[in-house]
Amino acid sequence: MAPVGRRFRAELVAAYLVACAVCLAGQSNAAEDPLFVSKKITPQGEYTSGIEGPAVDAAGNLYVVNFQQSGNIGKLAAGASQSQLFTSLSAGSIGNGIRFDRQGRMYVADFKKHNVWVIERGETTPHLYFHSDRFNQPNDLAIAADGTLYASDPRFASPVGGQIWRITRGADGKGQGEVMSSTRRLGVTNGIDLSPDGATLYVSESNSRQVWAYRLDGSKLLDPRLVRGFADFEVDGLRTDVDGRIYLARLSAGKIAIIGADGSLQREVPLSGKQPTNLTFGGPDGRTVFVTQKEGRFIETFRVDRPGREPCLQMPRMC
């Protein structure tokens, strides 16, 4: 048996260590942002009113189109509070959707010149990946595990006539695209993303304020299913998480709606700005949502409980 004094000192040390552990845990929890509470992270006016296409690379950097002027792509480094110029598209081109594949290539939809550009990992120079005169105006992009791109292609001047494109990588490294067939006449196709298993494509339609689901079969959109519609406010960009929930930007409502795959409205996240155009998942654990705001032309962010589908695609170890 240890002497009483020595035992008492040992008990004091043990109690101190436990208290420190509790204190540090409390500080860690306090430092963690509350879930589903949005805050602005960049200055107002950094981007044009065409702010769109947020996408995060494997290093955690955020990229957004139309930084300072149309045609530029801005980069918000991980943890930074101000964007910087990353690159510019060729004269006359204006970007919209951005996505990254597993190899770190960046793809940019160019609605003005009917292109999809690619920027190789570690580079800043855009190269033409795919062009078609049949494009209305390529808008947003979704990417599958094998690198297949799906592009929404709305005709904003008409409530019908929207398209969805499927673009694959050919042996020469160039994109090969085709308009997907559908048993349903499409409206103003806008936001687009895949289910976690890659079997279902979700598409928002601005004019009808609806989100539709399609079963994928090559270049066919099958079994159209209305996931959810809204009585007011346009719908814009959308992304899915690993549980198959849909995060949907509700333009002019100032909210991100979180919708179950069954169409249930699970939550609405109030935002700092009233005109969210699009969103993406990022952060070291894939649980940070970044939102582009047309009103004020800034980026805001909030934490969520589950990672996004795409971060888990790029870095499977996090999921």
What are these regions (language model features)?
Residues 64-84:
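Beta-propeller domains
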